[in-house]
Amino acid sequence: MKEKISNNIQIKNKRATFDYELLDTFTAGIVLTGTEIKSIRLGKASLVDTFCIVEKGELWVKNMYIAEYFYGTYNNHNARRDRKLLLTKKELRKIEGAVRASGFTIVPTRLFINEKGLAKVVVAIARGKKEYDKRDSIRERDDRREMDRAFKR
């Protein structure tokens, strides 16, 4: 039951771009166990309903799903445990200052494996969209598609 391991892992949080207005992005390292990185390399992770918090000067990602590794034994990881993100102090201060301002949150938008084989998470400072903003986004996207179709003819 050996599964194909891809070198081009890109796990995206498509829901974040719909629910939030993304303002500023940062690329962060993530602290993982051995079975977690193996599951990510197999593409068995999800960023849906994931969020970040700043706690004691550290950034933590909460509710991120990484499936248990199929070949893992008794030392397999918990699928939804909290994971620490690695950023510079300057980036952490900037994020912490933005989160203290009302209405802002930190949302992971993408999980990928870089060229060195390390897992990285792209987090964004975001502001929640209202229902009418979401409808406007859908309307703009549909209009863009119709214009593209018209130009192709």
UniProtKB/Swiss-Prot annotation:
Residue ranges that the Swiss-Prot or TrEMBL entry lists as coiled coil: none
Main location: cytoplasm
Transmembrane domains' residue ranges: none
Top-level taxon of the source organism: Bacteria
InterPro entries: SmpB, SsrA-bd_prot, SsrA-bd_prot_CS
Subcellular location: Cytoplasm
Keyword Cytoplasm: yes
Gene3D superfamilies in alphabetical order: 2.40.280.10
Family: Belongs to the SmpB family.
Entry protein name: SsrA-binding protein
Species in which this protein is naturally found: Parabacteroides distasonis (strain ATCC 8503 / DSM 20701 / CIP 104284 / JCM 5825 / NCTC 11152)
Source species taxonomy: Bacteria, Pseudomonadati, Bacteroidota, Bacteroidia, Bacteroidales
